[in-house]
Every structure is written in structure tokens, then in C-alpha cells.
């Protein structure tokens, strides 16, 4: 991977836009959850520390764009435009239609899907019924129609190139280029890549503290990556931020 990154740099390209782009490769590979059931201690898995080390190394080497700090901001969006020198993004399936396509201002067919460095997952789309609804049966019917009706799910996948929760349907889509190719991707059928990769995704151990830990460790170490604070200060900032958000946590 580093050899490829070095070759891309020689050609004037960044491998990825931001250190935040690679986080899920590491975060989805942790061996234990941030907080074990019944405990009040946050454990930072070695995979997360590997991300910190590699992110600093890659940023200093010029394999990532230093001007792009995190995700979901203007610089990150612009990194998807036709004037960008970013080679790839580590998106979920929904990132193509929801994020990449709206930010792209060039010709269709400039982007394509390929296998990631390793399997990972990044959230998804969810539907909820409100507690106390006056129409529980209707709510049930809507939820089942959106999550368990194969025809509906395949239509979502066809219209938005999104990976939906019908295993047999996604296997069919992977071999149906006529119906599931993407104009934005120059006629490529992304499901030919999505379906086999999804088979090997392993969900990381979860806890109720995941969102906060993931958010705060990226925020705290961003200044370290940018050279504004040293490692120890970034670590201390993370510990402080955790205890401020989760007063019940006794140790980090």
C-alpha cells in the first residue's frame, strides 16, 4: 500500500483525501469494544493506535492532503471535484450517490469502484417507528416494505447504487449488468464488487460509547497530525474530552 502511495505521489496525486478517510479500516478491526459490558474503563485498541501512527506517517509523507481536516466539510467535498488530486475515497455504497456524485463536476465515467485494502463497513440507512404511534400496523407494514421486500430493495439498489439487505438480491445484482450498471461510474456494475466484499465483513465489537470515542479520538489527534501539539498532549486532550462527555467513565 505504501509503495502504491509513493507512486501516486510521484504522479502528483494523494492516495486519500484525509486521515479520517482511513479510520474505518482500523476501527472496524478492533479486537475488543471501547468499553466492556459492566465496566467504566475505556480501552483504546491497538488497531486504533496503528491508525494514529500510520496517519501521522502518511500525512508527513505527503500521501494525504494536509488541507483536508476530517470529513463532511467544504475541503473534503472539494476533494471530490474535477480539480482535485485525490486518487480514491473509502466510501460506503451509499457514498457514491449521496456524496461523491453531488460533489463531482466532471464527466460521467471518471470514477469507478474497486476492492478496498480490506473489508470494512460504514453505517447504513435505517427506518424507525415513533414510540406511541397511533398506527402501529401501518408502521409495521412500511418498515417491512422498506427492509424485507426484495423487489423494493432491488429498486433502491438499482436507482441509487445502494447496497440493501437482501443477500440473494445483491448476488443477483452482482451479475445483472443490464439493470445495475451505473451511468455515473461509466457503465460499471458496482455490485460485482460490493457483494463478494460484503461476505467477508466482520462487525467490530460494539458498545454504547462507540460514537463518542470514535469522534473524540479523531478530533483530539487531528492537532497532532497537523503538528500543532505533540502525541502526549493529544492523548491528554482525548482523555479529558472523554471524561467531559462521559462522567461515568473512571479510566481511559
Per-region residue spans from a language model:
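Short helix-initiation/N-cap motifs at beta->coil->alpha
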Residues: 1-2, 67-79
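Extracytoplasmic/periplasmic substrate-recognition and gating elements
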Residues: 102-168, 199, 219
